[in-house]
Regions:
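Short, solvent-exposed aromatic-acidic interface loops
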Residues: 34-35, 82-85
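Anionic N-terminal interaction surfaces
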Residues: 1-24, 41-42, 71-77, 87-93, ...
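Phosphoinositide-binding peripheral membrane targeting modules
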Residues: 12-16, 23-64
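Canonical pleckstrin homology
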Residues: 54-82
Length: 103
């Protein structure tokens, strides 16, 4: 299981910080926002319709391009990596591969 230090933003939500784990069935985000207690959010790979790198201003997190997931339920989930920029493309490629397996 791979793990990444990330920022993420769900549709109509504020940015959260924490970690992302690539589990066998989907993504597992664990983190917090401000003083709110930590929470876990899961996204099954089958819910991911498209993966891309978001370069536009409104797609960035922390001023950097993000990995953008177009979700079947509607909306986009943005993932910003705290690690080196090269990891962003690796994560996008891995998520594309994992989400394609569910088709």
């Amino acid at each position: 299981m791979s793990s990444y230090a990330v920022l993420w933003s769900e549709p109509r939500q504020e940015v959260e910080t924490g970690k992302l784990e690539l589990e066998p069935a989907g993504l597992r985000f664990e983190g917090s926002r401000g003083r709110r207690p930590a929470r876990v959010h899961r996204v099954p790979y089958g819910e991911i319709e498209h993966v891309r790198i978001g370069h536009r201003i409104q797609e960035r997190l922390g001023g950097r391009p993000s990995v953008v997931l177009d979700l079947a339920a509607g909306g986009r989930l943005r993932i910003g990596l705290v690690d080196a920029p090269g990891v962003r493309s690796e994560l996008a490629d891995e998520l594309t591969r994992l989400s394609a397996k569910t088709d």
